[in-house]
Amino acid sequence: MNPNKEWVMRVTWKVPGDLITKWQGIVRYWMRQRNLKWNYYMHYQITWAWYTMSRYVIPIGKHGEICVDLYWHLTPEQGWLSTYAVGIQYVSNLESKYRTELDPATADSIIHGHYFNCFKERAIQQALRGHRFVFCQFPEGHKSTGQVPSLQYLALLAHQNGLRERSKRGKTRRSRNLGSKQGAVGQMAKRYVTRSQPGGEAAFWERTPVPSMELLSGGRRKTWYSHDGKGLQIL
C-alpha cells in the first residue's frame, strides 16, 4: 500500500539559472578568502528533498543555521525544465527545533552580523587620511536599518562619548574649546556625513561582490565592480 503523499510549501524566488551560477562563484570565492565554514551539498546528498539542485548551510552561532535551497525543474509537467528558484529558511538547533522562512533582507542582516564587518581594518588608516567611507563591505545587511553611517562619523562619535565618560570620572582634564553643548567633535562628525571624499569620485563603492541573498533572489539589478576595477555584471 502506497503511503499518503505529503506536501511541503516553501516561499521561493524564481530566478534565472545564470544568476545562481554567478552567486555560487561569489560564495566559493569568499569561502576560500575568509575560510568560511559554510557547508555545500549536492543534489545526490539530499535524497529526501525533490527538485533540490543544491543546498548551502550557513551556521549562525551555536543554536541555528541558515539553509539556502536552490531548486530546479520545478514545472516538468509543462516541459519547463530550466525553471529555477531559491528558498531561504532559518533552522533552530535548540531542543525545540523549528524552521521559519526568511526574506532576503533579513537573511542578509543575520549573515552580515556574523561573518562580515562593516569596514576593513585598513579602512581606519585611510579614514585618518581623509577618505570618506559611506558603504560597508556588506551594505545589503543594512536594508532594514537604512544607510550605513560613515566610518569617520562612527569613530568621532565613539571618541566624543569617550571624552564625556572620562570627563565624568574626572580622570583626565577637560578638553578645551569644545564649543556648544554638543562639542566640537560632535560638530565635526556632522560635517563628515555630507563631506565629499577628497581625491576620488566614488565612496568605497568598488568592491568584491558579497554572497548576498538579495542578489541571489534577483532583487538587485546593478553592475558591481571588483577591486581591480573590472565590471562584474550580475544581471
Swiss-Prot record:
Lipid bilayer topology: Peripheral membrane protein
Keywords from the UniProt entry: Host cell membrane, Host cytoplasm, Host membrane, Host-virus interaction, Membrane, Phosphoprotein, Ubl conjugation, Ubl conjugation pathway, Virion
Note from the entry: Vif-defective viruses show catastrophic failure in reverse transcription due to APOBEC-induced mutations that initiate a DNA base repair pathway and compromise the structural integrity of the ssDNA. In the absence of Vif, the virion is morphologically abnormal.
HCCH motif (motif): residue ranges: 112-142
Record GO cellular component, one term: host cell plasma membrane
Sites of Phosphoserine modification: S150
Designated gene of the protein: vif
Gene Ontology process terms (BP): viral life cycle
Function noted in UniProt: Counteracts the innate antiviral activity of APOBEC3G. Forms a complex with host APOBEC3G thus preventing the entry of this lethally hypermutating enzyme into progeny virions. Functions as an adapter molecule, recruiting APOBEC3G to the ubiquitin-proteasome machinery. Targets APOBEC3G for degradation through the assembly with elongin BC complex, CUL5 and RBX1. Binds viral RNA and affects the stability of viral nucleoprotein core. May play a role in viral morphology.
Protein name: Virion infectivity factor
InterPro entries: Vif
Top-level taxon: Viruses
Pfam families for this protein: Vif
